C-alpha cells in the first residue's frame, strides 16, 4: 500500500464541538460535515473540504501538511482547509518532507517562511492558535512559529521560541505592541510539540503544551492585526532581530474563538501518534 493510499484513509475528519467554537480537521478525501452547535448545522464537505462550524467562533485557517488536500507534496501553495480559503505561499525555499503521517515543512532559520496575504482574523481577543512544531535548534533566538498581523507595525500577536538575544528554548507569547510573555516552558531540540494558545476575551492568555495547561499570562492591550499572517517568521525582519524558525511545522490551526481544554486535549490526542 503506497503513502497516498494510506493517507486517504488515515487523514479522517474530527469534530471537537462545543457551544462556541469548533475545530475541523479535514479529510483528504472529503466527506460529510458534522452538525454545528448553536450556530447551525454544518454542510457537506467536498474533496478535502470543510464541514460545519458552530457558535460564535470558527476555524479561519487550517493547514495540514500530511493531508494531500492541504499540501500535495509539490509546488508553492499550501491550501487552507477551513471555509475561508486563506491559502499560503512558500517563500525562499521552504522544503517539504514526506514523513508518513507526520509530513512537515522544513524552515532553515534564515529566510524561509509561509505567507498568507491577509490577516486571517482581525480579532484582538477570543483567538486560538494551535500548531505542531519541532525546532531543530532551540537555542536560536527569536524563532517565530506563527504570527497574525504585522509585528513590524506593532500590531497582532504570535507564538515564538525565544525572543531576541534569548537562547533558553522557552515558548514566548508576543503581543505586537511591545509585550513579550515568557512562559518559562523550555522545549528540546528535535522534539515535536503541540502548542495551543488561547487569547481570551480580556486579552489574558493560556498556553497549552502537549495538551496540558502550562502557563497563564495577564491581560494587555492588543492592536488590531494588519497586512498578513505568517508561519515560520514575523515581518519584524528589517531590524537587528530577525524572527525566523529553524525547524519543522506540520499543522497550523487558527480559530476566531478560544478552544476549551477538552477540545485542545482531543486534538492533541487524535494527532500525537503521527509524531
Per-segment meaning from a language model:
Residues 2-111, 264-275:
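Extracytoplasmic low-complexity segments
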Residues 225-250, 254:
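Extracellular glycan-interaction patches encoded by glycine-rich segments
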Residues 151-153, 220-225:
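Short, surface-exposed loop/turn microsegments at beta-strand edges and helix-strand junctions
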Residues 82-111, 121, 129-140, 158-221:
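Extracellular glycan-interaction surfaces
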Residues 62, 92-93, 194, 251, ...:
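Extracellular/lumenal ectodomain signal focusing on beta-strand-rich modules
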Residues 57-60, 69-74, 78, 110-172, ...:
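Extracellular glycan-recognition modules
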Amino acid at each position: 500500500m503506497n503513502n497516498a493510499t494510506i493517507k486517504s484513509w488515515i487523514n479522517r475528519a474530527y469534530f471537537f464541538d462545543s457551544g462556541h467554537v469548533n475545530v475541523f480537521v479535514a479529510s483528504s478525501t472529503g466527506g460529510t460535515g458534522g452538525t454545528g452547535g448553536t450556530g447551525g448545522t454544518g454542510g457537506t464537505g467536498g474533496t478535502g473540504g470543510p464541514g460545519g462550524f458552530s457558535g460564535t467562533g470558527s476555524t479561519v485557517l487550517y493547514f495540514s501538511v500530511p493531508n494531500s488536500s492541504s499540501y500535495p507534496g509539490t509546488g508553492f501553495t499550501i491550501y487552507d482547509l477551513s471555509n475561508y480559503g486563506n491559502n499560503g505561499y512558500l517563500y525562499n525555499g521552504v522544503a517539504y518532507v514526506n514523513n508518513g503521517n507526520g509530513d512537515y515543512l522544513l524552515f532553515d532559520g534564515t529566510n524561509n517562511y509561509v505567507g498568507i496575504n491577509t490577516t486571517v482574523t482581525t480579532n484582538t481577543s477570543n483567538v486560538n492558535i494551535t500548531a505542531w512544531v519541532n525546532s531543530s535548534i532551540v537555542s536560536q533566538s527569536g524563532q517565530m512559529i506563527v504570527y497574525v498581523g504585522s509585528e513590524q507595525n506593532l500590531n497582532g500577536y504570535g507564538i515564538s521560541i525565544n525572543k531576541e538575544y534569548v537562547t533558553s528554548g522557552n515558548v514566548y507569547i508576543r503581543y505586537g505592541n511591545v509585550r513579550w510573555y515568557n512562559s518559562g516552558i523550555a522545549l528540546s531540540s528535535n522534539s515535536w510539540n503541540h502548542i495551543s494558545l488561547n487569547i481570551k476575551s480580556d486579552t489574558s492568555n493560556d498556553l497549552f503544551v502537549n495538551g496540558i495547561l502550562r502557563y497563564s499570562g495577564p491581560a494587555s492591550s492588543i492592536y488590531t492585526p494588519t497586512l498578513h499572517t505568517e508561519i515560520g517568521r514575523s515581518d519584524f525582519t528589517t531590524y537587528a532581530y530577525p524572527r525566523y524558525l529553524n525547524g519543522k511545522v506540520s499543522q497550523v490551526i487558527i480559530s476566531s474563538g478560544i478552544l476549551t481544554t477538552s477540545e485542545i486535549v482531543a486534538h492533541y490526542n487524535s494527532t500525537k501518534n503521527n509524531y
